[in-house]
């Protein structure tokens, strides 16, 4: 699922009783504008008692990442409905964008808890600035500046077909 981050601003329709109603802004993750509007009204009805029939959307904007090439750690607070009830959870993900971290969170929740998009509510997504503030060990291990990955399988040979042998006297050893 290719998600995008949207900022949706809406309010109640102006009336004689309330000529300048209060604006409500939300940042939502959705695959398209239509789903973003739908989720907006779903949350607004729960939180602020404003229904789609008595409200209007003032603006909807797609939010882009300011530094999409820098790896960052994101903390995500969620509330999800499982078969046994509603649970609060905090998770951390290392990614280059907020949208990438949220997509990883949805995949992780589906894999570990069988929770789908419709049953997960994102409360807050925050970039964790300092290494000391990272809570989860599975993210802390990636913050080592001298991190190295092993080369478990070596493939030797000549690039191209010019020096390739048809028959070899023994199988090559490809492990270090």
Swiss-Prot record:
Primary localization: cytoplasm
GO molecular function: structural constituent of ribosome
Cellular component, GO annotation: cytosol; cytosolic large ribosomal subunit; preribosome
Cysteine pairs bridged by disulfides in the record: none
Pfam families in UniProt: Ribosomal_L18A
Keywords: Cytoplasm, Ribonucleoprotein, Ribosomal protein
Single Gene Ontology BP annotation: cytoplasmic translation
Coiled coil: none
Record-stated family: Belongs to the eukaryotic ribosomal protein eL20 family.
Other facts noted in the record for this chain: There are 2 genes for eL20 in S.pombe.
Name the record gives this protein: Large ribosomal subunit protein eL20A
Organism name: Schizosaccharomyces pombe (strain 972 / ATCC 24843) (Fission yeast)
Gene name for this UniProt entry: rpl2001
């Amino acid at each position: 699922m290719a998600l995008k981050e949207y900022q949706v601003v809406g309010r109640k329709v102006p009336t004689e009783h309330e000529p300048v109603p209060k604006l409500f802004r939300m940042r939502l993750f959705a695959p398209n504008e239509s789903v973003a509007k739908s989720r907006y009204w779903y949350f607004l009805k729960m939180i602020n008692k404003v229904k789609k029939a008595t409200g209007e959307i003032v603006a909807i904007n797609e939010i882009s990442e300011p530094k999409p090439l820098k790896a960052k750690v994101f903390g995500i607070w969620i509330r999800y409905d499982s078969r046994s009830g509603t649970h609060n959870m905090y998770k951390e993900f290392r990614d280059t964008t907020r949208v990438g971290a949220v997509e990883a969170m949805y995949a992780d929740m589906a894999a570990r808890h069988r929770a789908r998009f419709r049953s997960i509510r994102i409360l807050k997504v925050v970039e964790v600035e300092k290494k000391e503030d990272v809570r989860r060990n599975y993210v802390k291990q990636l913050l080592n500046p001298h991190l190295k990955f092993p080369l478990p399988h070596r493939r030797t040979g000549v690039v191209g077909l010019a020096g390739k042998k048809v028959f070899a006297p023994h199988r090559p050893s490809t492990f270090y």
